[in-house]
Amino acid sequence: DGESFEAFNTSGGCATMCETYENKVETLSYKTIRYPGHLNHMKFLFNDLHLKKNKEVLEKLFDKEVPRTKNDVIIFFVKVIGLIDGVLQEQTYLRKIYGDENYSAIQLTTASGVCSVLKMYLDGKISNKGFVKQESLSWKDFIENKFGQVYA
């Protein structure tokens, strides 16, 4: 839709997917998407001003100088390239989730993700207990319950 963004790797995003898909997937990339300049601003704060070592000051700075907003957006984008019936194909899934008057997009997506997985567990769609790998969940079951609809 004409908006520009930047994407970069962040820690933890892939979680256990690297091990799960080892020798099954040629390339796995999991990135965060931000408005242009975000990464440089964070590097300046964390590295140049050394606020990575002084999180109390960083937190106070954010609380005082960065306005809170519900006017944010989460971009959920998946691209898969592979063989289907011997033909190389690409499939993509894109969903832009916006905040509303009650909740920011990050609040909506975080809460709905957790609640959707809990609902799946309560409905018996997740049988194991303890740690559950995100890649072991059924996408269909996830988005078909009332909490996962945010992602549908």
Regions found by a protein language model. Give the residues of each.
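C-terminal catalytic/substrate-binding lobe primarily of soluble NAD(P)-dependent oxidoreductases
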Residues: D1-A152
